[in-house]
Amino acid sequence: IQSTNMDQQGSLTEDSMNSFIRTLIQAGIWKNKVPKQTARAKDDTQTTVKKTEAEADAVASKEARLGFQPIVSVDAELLRQQRRFSSPRVLLSENTPLEPPPLYLTEQPVALNRTSRRKREGKSHRGEYSVCDSESRWVTDKSSAVDIRGHQVTVLGEIRMGPS
């Protein structure tokens, strides 16, 4: 951690305290998590540097008065709070889509050029593309198919969710 600037009287300025807080948060260091830094003196004795701890305690007492709760580490809970994820091909979201995919041929116009990816007609979302280029329509009259490993599988016409 780099040392912070001090004004002429020896007290921390507000800007330097803010930058120090940011440095602590970015480094994942706060209150009890401040490591004791040791420095070797020329005569091979170790001296504990307590300046960082004193500055952290001063900032912590000020922030406690303001009701500030620092973020110590980034964990899975913080990542779960993100509602939108980034993908170049599709929009990933925890929410269900506004409209279901078309189930019948009449609901979706047949594309003339099957090799190009095109956005769905009508109301669409950013990055919403067809998953498969080789098939441009929904197949609803199949009872069996071949999976990607070459095995024969049964196609379900309806999937029931919840208690039966």
From Swiss-Prot:
One of its GO terms (molecular function) is growth factor activity. Pfam families: NGF, NTF3_N. It is found in: Secreted. Disulfide bonds: none annotated. Keywords: Cleavage on pair of basic residues, Glycoprotein, Growth factor, Secreted, Signal. Residues 1-3 form the signal peptide. It comes from the Eukaryota. SUPFAM superfamilies: Cystine-knot cytokines. PANTHER family: NERVE GROWTH FACTOR NGF -RELATED, NEUROTROPHIN-3. This is Neurotrophin-3. It comes from Sanzinia madagascariensis (Madagascar tree boa). The gene is NTF3.
